[in-house]
Amino acid sequence: LQQVPPTAVLNGIAFFMTLFVMWPTFSAIYEKSFKPMSEGTITLEEAYTQAEAPLRIFMYEQLGNDGGKYIKNFMAMANMAQPETPKDVPTYILIPSYILHELTVAFKIGVILYIPFIIIDMVVASILMSMGMMMLPPVQISMPFKLILFVLVDGWGLLTQQLFVSVLH
C-alpha cells in the first residue's frame, strides 16, 4: 500500500489542480504576451516582459507577509540592497523565494496530515502491547483504521480544499 494511489494518478491530479489554480495567470499571459506576439504587434523581448509580469504578480501574492524573509535572505546572499518595492526584486531572486515558501507550506500540510495517522499508530500499538501481542505489527492493524478515517472525513476533499485555500487565499 506504499503507492496507493499510483504516482501517475497523483501526477495527473497535481497537473489538473495546477491548471485550475494557474488558469487566470495563464489567461493573462496569453492575452498580454502570446496573442500580440503571434499577431506581430510586439517583439519576442516585449512578449517575454509581458509574460513575466503576471507570473511575478502571482508569486508575490503567494509569498504574502511571511514570504518577505525569503526574499531578504536571497538578496543578502546575492550581496544586493534590500528592495524598496516589489519591482526592485529580480526574477532570479523571486523564483527561489517562491519555491522555498511553497515547500514550507507543503511541509506544514504534510505534518498536519501525518499527526492523526501517527496518533492512530500509537493507540493501536498501546492496545496491542497491553494485550501482550508484541509480535503483531501495529501497522497491520492500524491501516484499516487509517483508511476508514480518511474516507469518513473526506480526506481527498479536505486535502484539495486546503491546497486551494492556501493558494487562492
Predicted feature locations:
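Hydrophobic alpha-helical segments and their helix-loop boundaries in membrane
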Residues: 1-169
